[in-house]
């Protein structure tokens, strides 16, 4: 029987679908954090130089970094990225991290790209809100992005800003740059070894770092190479899964996936929440393979109407 110990639960997957992210505080042990930090410092100049070169920037003026291993090429299977003795590779293969990855994008997803984000102490500038794509296509398949912090980040210390629940809005990359101070947005701070896992569509931004400590973060994007259907530990799926009759205006359930999907961020209140419920239900149908799943009857109502129309046209 396949080992499920490190895979996500159905409850955690439902939280990911609802919020667009998961957070795992102090997940990576300190010796590995220290080794990964040293490797990140060595790799950072080279990664920045290659990025500027690709963008047509002034790459030639950058000092060549120590690069014990080149960055993987896009579409490389994750299992082939950063082989031993790489500390970043050890972090990605750490059992709890591997289980998270497998639950969301499969056992051996494709490497998309990665980058080392270094915000020096006292850095005054941050980023605007953005999505890491030009325009998200239709369909439910998704990439994930891991944000790994090998050192502690104090409040106000340059932690990533992000908007929970924004991932299903299919926004243009820069189309949300004008939004500021969104109600319910979070500013990351936390202990060393913390991992944030984002849906590709989550709105986020780098922050200024007025603190006296440099902030380091490693980000990697992964593409699924298999259908993302029931890849997690489904031992609790039967207990939490609801049928389409779970309807808050009729007979709502209590400990169900639908109940989790009714939980809204502060900016999603009112009728906005209904839109979010429909998007979450559609994504959950993809992940579970259950084409009847629904929250508050919205998708089912459409199917019933379409069926009635089909009968009338016969």
Please tell me what each predicted stretch does.
Residues 202, 207-314:
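Non-heme Fe(II)/2-oxoglutarate
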């Amino acid at each position: 029987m396949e080992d499920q110990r490190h895979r996500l639960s159905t409850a955690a997957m439902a939280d990911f679908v609802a919020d667009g992210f998961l957070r795992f505080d102090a997940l990576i042990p300190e010796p590995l954090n220290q080794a990964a930090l040293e490797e990140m410092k060595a790799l950072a100049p080279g990664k920045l130089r290659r990025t500027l070169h690709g963008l047509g920037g002034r790459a030639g003026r950058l000092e060549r970094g120590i690069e014990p291993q080149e960055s993987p090429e896009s579409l490389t299977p994750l299992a082939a990225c950063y082989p031993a003795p790489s500390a970043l590779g050890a972090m990605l293969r750490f059992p709890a991290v591997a289980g998270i990855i497998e639950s969301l994008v499969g056992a051996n997803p494709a490497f998309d790209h990665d980058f080392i984000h270094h915000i020096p102490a006292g850095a005054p500038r941050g980023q605007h809100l953005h999505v890491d794509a030009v325009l998200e296509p239709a369909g439910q398949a998704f990439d994930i992005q891991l944000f790994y912090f090998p050192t502690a980040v104090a409040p106000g210390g340059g932690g990533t800003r992000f908007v929970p629940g924004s991932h299903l809005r299919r926004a243009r990359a820069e189309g949300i740059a004008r939004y500021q101070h969104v109600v319910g947005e979070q500013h990351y701070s936390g202990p060393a070894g913390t991992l944030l896992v984002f849906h590709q569509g989550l709105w986020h931004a780098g922050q200024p770092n007025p603190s006296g400590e440099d902030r380091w973060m490693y980000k990697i994007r992964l593409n699924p190479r298999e259908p993302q259907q029931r890849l997690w530990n489904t031992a609790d799926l039967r207990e939490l899964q609801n049928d389409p009759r779970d309807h808050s205006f009729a007979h709502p359930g209590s400990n169900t996936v639908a109940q989790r999907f009714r939980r809204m961020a502060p900016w999603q209140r009112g009728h906005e929440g209904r839109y979010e419920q429909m998007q979450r239900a559609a994504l959950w149908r993809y992940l579970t393979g259950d084409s009847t799943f629904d929250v508050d009857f919205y998708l089912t109502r459409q199917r019933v109407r379409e069926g009635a129309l089909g009968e009338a046209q016969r």
